[in-house]
Amino acid sequence: MFIAPPSAKPVELGVDFSIASSGDKVEILVGDVTKVPNPRSGREMLAMAPSNVAVPMKEYVTFTATRMQPLPKGWLIPKPLVGSPRLAAALDRLRWHGIKIQEFASDQQLAVERFSIAEITKAPRPFQGHQEARLKGAFDRVQLTVDAGSLFIPANQPLARLAFYLIEPESDDGLVTWNVIDEGLAVGQTYPIYRVVDSRAIVVKSR
């Protein structure tokens, strides 16, 4: 099975975001309060009332991308990492989300981008049982011999955007963020999933 090169204009997606206001103020319902005497001291205090009041304020419900990355043709997991404990949980998560994963049918020479890690930041406190992580670094483009049996996650699938946000090393809400990809990450090391940027067709096994 061949995956043809994309012909459309390259798509860019965000990896960093800032929250944006809606512009004009809107009325937000908040719980009203009433003044009542403190049962212990007798002093006046505020207590929740059984009603709501509309308060004009700006609402922050949208996000704006502050840094973009081009969507690659897909992502490559080299054969030595296929079946390894290091990426087992990541592959499980991708499959649980319904993201299509294919297998290279033969050895191929491809242009890929590898991400070299320059900085790792972890949240000082756990959130939902995880130490949220962020990576900083740079991509370099190389020609690579991809072994048959390596895995390919194509970007020409309905869940491409989801795949991007989960896989990209600098994503602010991906597999790195939630420590799903954690083992082996260190400054000076290469992120284990590569971006495929080659214009040539890719040969994968038919399902």
PLM region descriptions:
Residues 1-112, 116:
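Hard-cation-handling environments
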Residues 69, 79, 83-85, 91-96, ...:
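Catalytic centers of hydrolytic enzymes
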